[in-house]
Regions:
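Active-site SXXK
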Residues: 1-18, 46, 98-102, 150-156
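Active-site helix/loop module of the DD-peptidase/beta-lactamase fold
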Residues: 12-52, 77, 106-141, 145
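Structural helix-adjacent loops and short alpha-helical linkers that scaffold large soluble proteins
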Residues: 13-19, 57-58, 103-115, 161-169, ...
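Solvent-exposed loop and edge beta-strand segments that line ligand/cofactor-binding
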Residues: 34-37, 83-90, 138-144, 219, ...
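Active-site-proximal alpha-helical segments within enzyme catalytic domains
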Residues: 94-101, 141-162, 225-242
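Flexible, glycine-rich surface segments
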Residues: 120, 125-184
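Active-site Gly/Thr loop motif
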Residues: 124-127, 178-236
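Structured C-terminal helix/loop/strand segments within mature extracytoplasmic catalytic/sensor domains
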Residues: 219-267
Length: 267
């Protein structure tokens, strides 16, 4: 969702491109390390989850962010720990900051911007978006959608940014945002045995059916939400569950279901 909104913001002229430095969007956070030291971290690094910051365990850092009371400031004050843009490492931080970029560039919070653009065009009205006390939206995983509305997002990507004959997001953004950009960092949270790389907040995955490789663009949500887009099959798959608090490996059960049950039935 966050990736689509960034694309719409860029298409609308609110953003100059993915090479813009992140620190330029947050002048009100002067005093934080990213701002004062002008870290060479760009929007592209956030989109590919490769800012190379010292965030530690992904789950623990997300919990620390929620306790901090300043979600944006929490991430902007972390140390740089490597070279940005080399490997993807799943974390809530880049997504939260991209939500802040949307707010800075458009003057609207992510849900407000979505309501005027993406949600309006796709007729999405039943949703809930978690937010902090200061209004910051939880663009790292705080959005609740119906399965039907999530499927609409997949269909939008499958149709290269078109919805019912209307251009919602540019085909160039869709193509760039779903292609493989980076490998995953060793031991990174969220990657599955089916994962081949990371795009702009999308997982690139391969499934094997009757010795045929089927490529997919995948998004996952905490608790067992799965969105799979299969361009060669012209198909979108959505699975919902509520396995809150389960080991992250349980997420991969859905990949097995897709490979062993759903995809064979579609071929």
């Amino acid at each position: 969702m966050t990736s689509l909104l960034i694309g719409i913001a860029q298409d609308g002229g609110f953003l100059g491109g993915v090479d813009e430095p992140v620190y330029t969007f947050f002048p009100e956070h002067a005093g934080k390390k990213w701002i004062d030291r002008k870290y060479p971290i760009t929007l592209a690094h956030l989109l590919t989850m490769s800012p190379a910051i010292e965030s530690g365990d992904a789950v623990e850092s997300a919990e620390a962010m929620h306790r901090s009371g300043d979600w944006i400031g929490y991430w902007l004050d972390l140390d740089q720990a490597g070279v940005p843009g080399e490997v993807a490492e799943y974390s809530s931080g880049p997504s939260i900051l991209l939500g802040g970029v949307i707010r800075s560039a458009t003057g609207k919070y992510a849900d407000e911007f979505a309501e005027e653009t993406l949600f309006a065009d796709l007729h999405v009205s039943s949703y809930r978006w978690q937010k902090a006390g200061d209004g910051t939206r939880e663009t790292g995983g705080g959005l609740t959608l119906t399965a039907y509305d999530l499927a609409k997002m997949g269909q939008l990507v499958l149709d290269k940014g078109m919805w019912n004959g209307k251009r919602v997001v540019s085909d160039t953004w869709i193509a760039e945002s779903v292609r493989r950009h980076l490998p995953l960092a060793e031991g990174a949270l969220g990657g599955s045995p089916y994962t081949t790389g990371f795009a702009y907040h999308w997982w690139n995955q391969n499934y094997q059916v009757d010795e045929v490789t089927i490529q997919a663009i995948v998004a996952r949500g905490y608790g067992g939400q799965y969105l799979g887009i299969f361009p060669t099959l012209n198909t979108v798959v959505v699975l919902y569950n509520g396995e809150w608090g389960q080991p992250s490996e349980r997420v991969f059960d859905y990949d097995v279901i897709v490979e062993k049950r759903i995809l064979p039935a579609l071929r």
